[in-house]
């Protein structure tokens, strides 16, 4: 099994690249998010590799971050999600954004990925709610998402309330995701979510 490749970027195609490692060219499939960060042809790069062995072929999938590779594997535990769908999701959402979407039951956010419909998105949230990898909670500020649609009603109400209190929508959503994780297993109301979120959003913390 190949776990990591370090070599020279030789060719770039629509869905894969060729990495030259000491004269051997490896075909590595990548997500759309990785393409803009690729080095120039002829320059070196290092990728975490997930190897899929099938009767007809051996396929290598490359990721810059270990978290992306872990999510790639985790997503494929969901019925109906194969390598192609998992890669499409990771090509649309970062690991942090995906973890946030699952924590917030945000079906619409996951459905933004090409070829991922509502039913698959609902299955991902349902199956991975208790297994999802944690996202980076060191900072509540993150890249804004223009179409954040929360489908869990108490969370939706809490989000609206926090926005009315003057917090940025994306900042409030991140705090709510942390609150949802902390309150897992409890009966969650919008008031309870608001209280927990305000503690996270308070300047004193």
From Swiss-Prot:
Location of region: Domain III: 150-205
Chief place where the protein resides: cytoplasm
Keyword Glycoprotein: no
GO MF term list: ATP binding; four-way junction DNA binding; four-way junction helicase activity
SMART domains tied to this protein: HhH1
Record's keyword terms, sorted: Cytoplasm, DNA damage, DNA recombination, DNA repair, DNA-binding
Subcellular location as annotated: Cytoplasm
Family: Belongs to the RuvA family.
Quaternary structure (record): Homotetramer. Forms an RuvA(8)-RuvB(12)-Holliday junction (HJ) complex. HJ DNA is sandwiched between 2 RuvA tetramers; dsDNA enters through RuvA and exits via RuvB. An RuvB hexamer assembles on each DNA strand where it exits the tetramer. Each RuvB hexamer is contacted by two RuvA subunits (via domain III) on 2 adjacent RuvB subunits; this complex drives branch migration. In the full resolvosome a probable DNA-RuvA(4)-RuvB(12)-RuvC(2) complex forms which resolves the HJ.
Name of this protein: Holliday junction branch migration complex subunit RuvA
Species name: Bartonella quintana (strain Toulouse) (Rochalimaea quintana)
């Amino acid at each position: 099994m190949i776990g990591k490749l370090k070599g020279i970027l030789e060719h770039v195609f629509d869905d894969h690249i060729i990495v030259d490692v000491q004269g051997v060219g490896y075909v590595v499939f990548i997500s759309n998010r990785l393409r803009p960060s690729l080095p120039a042809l002829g320059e070196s790069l290092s990728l975490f590799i997930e190897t899929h062995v099938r009767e007809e072929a051996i396929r290598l999938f490359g990721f810059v971050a270990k978290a992306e590779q872990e999510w790639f594997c985790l997503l494929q535990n969901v019925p109906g999600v194969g390598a192609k769908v998992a890669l499409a999701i990771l090509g649309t959402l970062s690991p942090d954004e995906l973890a946030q979407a699952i924590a917030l039951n945000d079906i619409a956010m996951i459905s933004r990925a090409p070829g991922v419909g509502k039913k698959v998105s609902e299955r991902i949230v349902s199956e991975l709610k208790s297994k999802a990898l944690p996202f980076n909670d060191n900072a509540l500020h993150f890249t804004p998402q223009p179409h954040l649609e929360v489908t869990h009603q108490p969370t939706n109400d809490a989000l609206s309330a926090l926005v009315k209190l003057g917090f940025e929508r994306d900042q409030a959503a991140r705090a709510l995701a942390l609150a949802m994780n902390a309150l897992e297993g409890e009966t969650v109301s919008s008031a309870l979510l608001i209280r927990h979120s305000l503690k996270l959003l308070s300047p004193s913390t």
